[in-house]
Amino acid sequence: MIRVTCGVYSLLNCLYLPQVSYVIRDEVEKYNRNGVNALQLDPALNRLFTAGRDSIIRIWNVNQHKQDPYIASMEHHTDWVNDIVLCCNGKTLISASSDTTVKVWNAHKGFCMSTLRTHKDYVKALAYAKDKELVASAGLDRQIFLWDVNTLTALTASNNTVTTSSLSGNKDSIYSLAMNQMGTVIVSGSTEKVLRVWDPRTCQKLMKLKGHTDNVKALTLLNAECLSGSSDGTIRLWSLGQQRCIATYRVHDEGVWALQVNEGFTHVYSGGRDRKIYCTDLRNPDIRLLICEEKAPVLKMELDRSADPPLASKRTTVNPDIVLSSGDYENDCSTPLSPICSQPDQVIKGGASIIQCNILNDKRHILTKDTNNNVAYWDVLKACKVEDLGKVDFEEEIKKRFKMVYVPNWFSVDLKTGMLTITLDESDCFAAWVSAKDAGFSSPDGSDPKLNLGGLLLQALLEFWPRTHINPMEEEENEVNHVANGEQENRIQKGNGYFQVPPHTPVIFGEAGGRTLFRLLCRDSGGETESMLLNETVPQWVIDITVDKNMPKFNKIPFYLQPHSSSGAKTLKKDRLSASDMLQVRKVMEHVYEKIINVDTESQTTSSSNNEKPGEQEKEEDIAVLAEEKIELLCQDQILDPNMDLRTVKHFIWKSGGDLTLHYRQKST
């Protein structure tokens, strides 16, 4: 038995380096952005639950044929939702996700009640025993855990510990799971190509069934009979009593990924990679129907058992009363069939999924292309879409927006959910500095300060977290100084002072290995519970920038400065210089003019100028103008634009190892 504490996973339990992610999206995502992995139907309320690869569970009214069927979204997962089961007569929903968690939901109100974190890898499958209100979960960590649903629904903030049993013995990742209604038998399918059978009451393994030649992707179980669908393209019927396969159905041309059976276990509905859905009579396998053909592989099916008559009996050729003949048999139906349903009764449309992206070289904007071939332009810093460009040439748009500017990488992009997920790691989050002017921001005092993009973004993401409003070291002093005259609230500085991100933006604190520690919306970080959980999960490198306001150091770049060979000047001592990588070429030109060229001029004119130094008479702005008029700076014999910075020169022109070398010469008159 294992005791599990539900809720947030503390930083103290981190196995990998912590990171921060956020999703750029609309406030309400009504449509499935990616594949639908699982379905559950509540016939009493005419509600369909869909679990998406966009991390969202959605609720639909299946009676709304003409009006918008969307009811609500259930959002708390951060990766693909792989499976869902309805329990307690539709009151409770259990979900399994690639974020390694199992979540318990109030299905009627649509909120997450608790989170189970026992799995160490993707959770791929769930199984439900209706008579016992027992749920099993399994995944890529090869573990199966058993959960009492009534215990899960009774969990509270103070009573947040639950006991679970585990079934060990699988040698490979588990992709499918089935349990009978009485909760006395569990069957698992895996990449081991076998079925393993357990008694959940004793946690003892009963048998191992061999026969498939590829991953077992789908299972269904009734009493002592089990059906399995595999990526090897076959459906197999197993007798648990005889511990062997008693029938093999070769209905599909490719892998079988989804199975459903009628209540009498006489007909099986199957779908998979070949996009076809068949109904096969288990007792007479020569009788089969091609129900329909989809436009994409079938990931999951749900049979509406309340339909009268059921789909399989709409054709007189299907006889539900046929009894299985004695003996084993194997069918191979190769005769082409025409689908009996050319059009679906109802279609719940999905949304476009982002399938391609390009980070522009300003390291702030992204171009994306979706499944409808629409191109969009995004601002990573402000976490928003800037413009829909429509069906335009993606590569041409990239070329149009190219700028001769180099900014270091400071974030990574993931398209797994069909939306833009931006991830910040401590190793490079603070690598990118830009000037406020270049970023399009104005400073109140008219100056042009240097801004750290990662730092600004973190401050914006946690703008509503009270701990970031006042440095705890200064809080007491501020209260003494300002409470008396009511000015404290006005003096609290929130965010970064330049921009805000949309308050609905989901922020995710997790591990580099994929495990999620905590997910919340930006606007919710001011809540008492959320604020407390942030104290436990926000990593120190984020605290440093958002709470303590400790800005990272500027990036330095070493370089050498030498006269150009065409100038005829003697080569100087090769001193290694160092400056901010954002230093503009014009500043180096000013240095050359003032400290090198002007010094030579002074030594030649001292005797005839009454000891007046030209440098003393020139204002700073005059030096800048004169430097550009008289000095050229070169790299690899290419004349440099004064507006370039050193990092751009090194990236686009120097293009080689070792320290950057710049040459100067006077312009020919």
Indicate residue ranges for each PLM-predicted region.
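Intrinsically disordered, low-complexity acidic/Ser/Thr/Pro-rich linker and tail segments
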Residues: M1-Q40, A44-Q64, L311-D345, I492, ...
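Short C-terminal beta-strands that terminate individual repeats in beta-propeller domains
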Residues: I24-Y31, P69-H76, C112-T118, A138, ...
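Loop/turn segments within WD40 beta-propeller blades
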Residues: L39-L45, V85-G90, A127-K132, A178-G183, ...
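Conserved strand-to-loop turn within each blade of WD40 beta-propeller repeats
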Residues: A51-D54, A96-D99, S137-D141, V149, ...
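WD40-repeat beta-propellers
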Residues: I57-V62, V102-W105, L126, I144-V149, ...
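Extended, C-terminal alpha-helical/coiled-coil scaffolding tails that mediate protein-protein interactions
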Residues: G495-T669
